[in-house]
Every structure is written in structure tokens, then in C-alpha cells.
Amino acid sequence: MFSKIFPKIHAEGYKFLVISGIITIVFYSFSNFLGLIGLVLTIWVYYFFRDPDRVIIDDNNYLVSPADGEIIKVEEVDGPKELGLENKRFNKISVFMNVFDCHVNRTPCAGKIEEILYKPGTFVNASLDKASEDNERNYFKIKDTDNNDIIVVQIAGLVARRIVCESNKDQELKQGDRIGMIRFGSRADVYYENYQPLVKVGQKAISGETLLAKK
């Protein structure tokens, strides 16, 4: 029960929590009102970097959401040219994370990471179509248990300036394993083949729990 009310925070959040805590103390030295503002800031930092445990279905017939947020795209597209897949068709689901969503990212399937590719870029609004090609982003090419290509892309947003990758090439993943996070507003794209989508645009998703697609 305690962990549900006060989930652990991601390691990336500790330094921000310390900084906001120091700011709160300094603010309190000037006035209670400023101190209250600092306290609200500290609580928000804790909330943003929360890393709650999730109930993972652990079923290779499904893909789960890599992120908390809103489904903004369900479409058929060419694969990412950065991975040499521009001549291959994929289904794609995009999940937009606002600053109030949990920003820890998880793998949608069990499998092996074949490639990780980081691309620097701009920081336009992550909900825009061009964000998937222009923004700072990080690609994971994963082979699922049936040898399908599953691509997860972390995309930095208008506010986000740091993509955190916590995985390595050739790493074996269990469904729902943490693979990284993005700080302060962002998006996650999933490219997949041989699955049928189960979600619609506008639907809310929970990382590791919401079923995105089924074989």
C-alpha cells in the first residue's frame, strides 16, 4: 500500500530532488510563502520522476505500451530510415507523454536488442508528425520471440532535453522491462509487424500494462 501512494523514484530524479529541496530551504529563509512554492516544486519533481511498479501481462501474443500517456497515432508507415527499414512497412503506435505522466519507458515485448541508435535533433512539440524525424531521439531495434522486428523510439519533446537509455545492444529483455526514460515531456513510438492494433487515438495508456496490439 505504501509503495502505491509513495512509489520509488527513478535514479535520474535524485539530483533534481536535492536541488529543489535546497531551493525550498532557501525560499523559506525569505518567507513562508516562497517556502511553500519551493515545497510544491519539490513535490512535483518527486511526482515527475516516480517509477511505480507495474503488473506485466508477460504474454508473447501481445505488445504492451512503452510509456504512460495518450495514444496520438495508430497508422501504417514505412520503417525508420535511420535503421535501414524505409522499404519495409510497419504499423506504428505513438504515445504522447505530458509533463504529468510517468516518463519511465518499458519494452513492449520480450526479445533481444539488435541495435540502439541515438540521433541528435531539434525540440519541437513531440505531438507533431515531424517530431519523429526532426527531434532528438533514440531507437531500439528488438527481435521478439517470433523473430519479428519491433522498434521503440524515444523522442524528446518541446521541454525535454535529455533522453536516458538504460539498455545495451544484445541485451535480452523480458516484456515490460525498463529501457530508459525521457525528462520533462516527450513521446514514444512503437513500430511493429504481424500484430493487430488494439487501441485507438485518444485512449490513455499505462506503460507495461496497456495492451497495444495482438498477434
What spans do the regions from the language model cover?
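Contiguous, well-folded functional domains in the mature portion of proteins
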Residues: 1-215
